[in-house]
């Protein structure tokens, strides 16, 4: 599943066939179908796995960081280490898979709630102004993540 999700994230979902996945894993397509009903099932499970991993990571940064800025920068640093998570083609193809879109939406909503918690913490710490339009900042951050091409944006860092 991780191999399949990595291929989807790197090349776009539509571009990756079940044959490509089987070949990459060194197994037969039949073996894949013994565990997964179809490509969307693989995709959905990959999304769940990836978001749970990032959610756990963010939770760790949130609880172990002394300041909210430390938590945000630590997590953001982890995100940019994984450029495959930002392929524009992946997000464009995702629209063709309704169950996967639903899962993605749910996790984005959870992520927004976590961001809100971090923002509130930042206001309490005196790092953020309470007058900031949090919804706009969240919208910009989500769009930034979907449009980002770290290989180009961060090549000098």
Which residues fall in each region the model found?
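Generic hydrophobic, amphipathic alpha-helix propensity
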Residues: 1-4, 21, 46-50, 54, ...
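Hydrophobic alpha-helical connector segments
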Residues: 45, 56-85, 138-141
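Short secondary-structure transition hinges
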Residues: 80-117, 136
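Hydrophobic alpha-helical bundle segments that form small-molecule/ligand-binding pockets
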Residues: 109-144, 155-156
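A short secondary-structure junction motif
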Residues: 53, 82-86, 118, 122, ...
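Short amphipathic alpha-helical elements of helix-turn-helix/winged-helix folds
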Residues: 3-7, 78
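Helix-turn-helix
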Residues: 7-41, 45
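Helix-turn-helix/winged-helix DNA-binding modules
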Residues: 10-13, 63, 129
């Amino acid at each position: 599943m991780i191999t399949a999700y990595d291929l989807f994230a790197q090349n776009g979902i539509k571009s990756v066939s079940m044959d490509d996945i089987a070949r990459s894993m060194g197994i037969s397509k039949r073996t894949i179908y013994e565990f997964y009903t179809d490509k969307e099932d693989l995709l959905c499970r990959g999304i769940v796995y990836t978001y749970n991993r990032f959610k756990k990571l963010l939770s760790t940064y949130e609880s172990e960081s002394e300041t909210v800025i430390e938590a945000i920068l630590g997590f953001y640093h982890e995100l940019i280490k994984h450029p495959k998570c930002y392929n524009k083609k992946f997000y464009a193809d995702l629209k063709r898979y309704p169950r996967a879109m639903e899962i993605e939406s749910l996790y984005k909503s959870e992520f927004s709630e976590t961001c809100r918690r971090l923002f509130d913490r930042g206001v309490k710490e005196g790092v953020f102004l309470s007058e900031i339009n949090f919804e706009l900042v969240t919208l910009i951050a989500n769009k930034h993540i979907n449009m980002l091409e770290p290989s180009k944006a961060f090549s000098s860092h």
